[in-house]
Amino acid sequence: MKLLLTFTGAIAALIGSKSAFAEYTLNMTKGITDLSQDIYWLHMMAFWVCVAIGVVVFGAMFYSIVAHRKSKGVKAANFHESTTVEFIWTGIPILILIAMAIPASKTLIDIEVLEKADMTVKVTGIQWKWQYDYPEEGISFVSNLAQSSRDVIKASPEEREAVHNESTYLRSVDKHLVLPVDTTVRFLITSNDVIHNWWVPAFGVKQDANPGFINDAWAKPNEIGTYRGQCAELCGKDHGFMPIVVDVVSKADYAAWVESKQAEKVAELASATQEWTEAELVARGEEVYNANCSGCHQKDGSGIPGVFPAMIGSEVTNGPADYQIGMVLNGLRGMPAFKMLSDTDIASVITYERRSFGNNGSVVQPSDVTSAR
């Protein structure tokens, strides 16, 4: 009895705590696009129709059970089928289904048909990151899980507990997708390897990313803010480490962001033609390694025996640089290609791998990567 009282008290305390239900909800989000709000309205309409049907059906059933029970001396009626009743209980559900199907069909058409978009963004799923391309603006970048979340994966239990209490744990990225408010955006969604799924609940968008195919979706965000999503298709060991973060900003801020990204691109192209020092390459390479390579080869370069080779003492990192450059550019069995990275990033990460972890490989310059492409 004492154990039962203790357990009951603990449950009551948990239910009564504010933190237990601070962000807990059973309902879907309304979202910040007209489309997501239409979907929410459909969801709620169907819910209340089901509630009304449940009240009528179960109300009639329980009333019949109680009011016509045998203990009250009620005798069951003896009658055959009623054509009128059969028409009623067939016709009413048909009318309900038609009433629900009309707005649902309209919303489905709105989801699938986009007459004109103000801008286009190509979304490419890659194990285990997202690549975003703005073809009209000439902008392209890869979005990885934020380093703050990566660091805690192998942290102490106390450090993990501290981060688990943060709402952005495993939901933050190093580079956000940026979109202007009140702008119709067409998303072209594909994959470089396996099937992924690009899902942003606030947009009402959830679309498969299939290798070799391009699926499209669209959204017109109406509110400025930061919105999060996730890969919604089991895609390998780090499936849970593929968050999506979208910043919806004013049109003026978006124009400034585009200008800054285009300036970064010019600077990046210029950096690929210059000679870098080993220290500069190693410093930059460590950041690239932690974002793109540490998930498999581990942050300390130890790898996972029998699965992912170690960087420490590797024949690749201590061997000819040309072979390693080709491996990073084109991939290998069990390792994806990293052509989406800039020449400077590839040169930096290769140099980091070849000059860290006790290795004594040669330094690689961005021009070496440019020549190998």
Model-predicted regions and their roles:
Residues K261-A291, P336-R373:
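Flexible coil segments in periplasmic/lumen-exposed cytochrome c-class electron-transfer proteins
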Residues A22-M45, I65-A279, A283:
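Non-transmembrane, membrane-proximal soluble domains of secreted or membrane proteins
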